């Protein structure tokens, strides 16, 4: 089975990341912040006939090549691929967020986040939440 590869440098350029890339918490935090500052949450495709494709190559083309944003499944999906290419151990999981204005949780499977394992510790990473209160660094 062929391992998918991406142009990692092009992705790092897209998010404006410069400097050393290593499998560390400090690097993960910087990658997360740079991604959030450069790639917007957007759901413009909901208003078109464009079919959502969640394969790595399609997400990369949308976010990196075409300089678009996306929703949580697209943003976290593409970011997980970048992290894997850099050597991080990543799991993709379903999540629910709490909406304080409505006083309730969102629907099950309505959100997607990443779990990154570093030195036997697990960190929640989310670059795909369209809200100002989105965590800007990994949460242990």
Where in the sequence are the language-model features?
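Secondary-structure boundary elements
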Residues: 2-67
């Amino acid at each position: 089975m062929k391992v998918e590869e991406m142009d990692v440098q092009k992705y790092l350029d897209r998010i404006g990341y410069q400097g050393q890339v290593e499998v560390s918490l400090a690097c993960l935090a910087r990658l997360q912040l740079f991604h959030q500052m450069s790639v917007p949450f957007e759901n413009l495709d909901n208003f078109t006939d464009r079919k959502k494709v969640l394969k790595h190559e399609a997400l990369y083309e949308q976010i990196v090549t075409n300089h678009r944003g996306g929703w949580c499944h697209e943003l976290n999906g593409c970011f997980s691929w970048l992290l894997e290419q850099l050597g991080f151990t990543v799991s993709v999981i379903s999540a629910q967020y709490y909406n304080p204005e409505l006083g309730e949780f969102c629907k099950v499977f309505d959100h997607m986040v990443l779990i990154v394992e570093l030195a036997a510790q697990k960190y929640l990473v989310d670059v795909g939440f369209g809200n100002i209160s989105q965590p800007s660094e990994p949460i242990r």
